Amino acid sequence: VYKRQIKDLVKLKNKKTRDEKGLFLVDGFHMVEEAKKAGLCDLVISTDESLEGQDKVLVVSDSVMEKLSYTKTPQPIMAVCHKKDNILKHYDRVLILDGVQDPGNLGTILRSALAFGFKQIVMSPDCVDLYNDKVLRSTQGAVFHLDIVRDDLSHVIPELQKLGVRVIATSLHNASSIDDIKSTDKMAFVMGN
């Protein structure tokens, strides 16, 4: 059973498996703590033998932790987390991301969005995988405190507009200054790569 469980956990490093299972791995004390706070932590994986026998804790050897971890020198703790529902929940301040490909950029954008009070993020299908280890690390836990959906923007934007959300996009050509835009209660901002 143990070997099978480890094999299944290693498979979570693969996007296809993450999508099929609705699960993903996070590395390190901070990320595990943030996942727990958000109620998304299903299983803690640790090399700390003093945790043996605790509920929802799997104690593994250092060599197994190295197989599971994304980093060369893993921290002694990881977690298996479940993905949130892919449903729009908040309409007051929405950040729409169109084609963001760089994992570090996506993570930084998500951290900034949380800092600026956004609760809802919409990602186009061609954005980098949200559960890519580099994205998760660069969010520093912000990913656990945002509602994030992946959907076709040609469906989402008209739906938001029907709900009275003003949609504002960045553009290099024929654009108005951000200073000229009047703030409304419901706004969505579109950013590209």
Predicted regions and their residues:
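Short loop/helix-cap segments at secondary-structure boundaries that form the rim of catalytic
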Residues: 49-56, 86-90, 181
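Generic beta-sheet signal
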Residues: 47, 59-61, 80, 124, ...
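Hydrophobic alpha-helical segments and helix pairs
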Residues: 64-102
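Active-site/ligand-binding-proximal alpha/beta "capping" segment
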Residues: 169-193
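Boundary-proximal intrinsically disordered activation/regulatory segments immediately upstream
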Residues: 3-48, 127-128
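Short, polar loop motifs at secondary-structure junctions
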Residues: 29, 46-51, 83-84, 172-173
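RNA substrate-binding interface of SAM-dependent RNA methyltransferases
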Residues: 88-175
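Active-site regions of enzymes building and remodeling cell-envelope glycoconjugates
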Residues: 53-64, 185-187
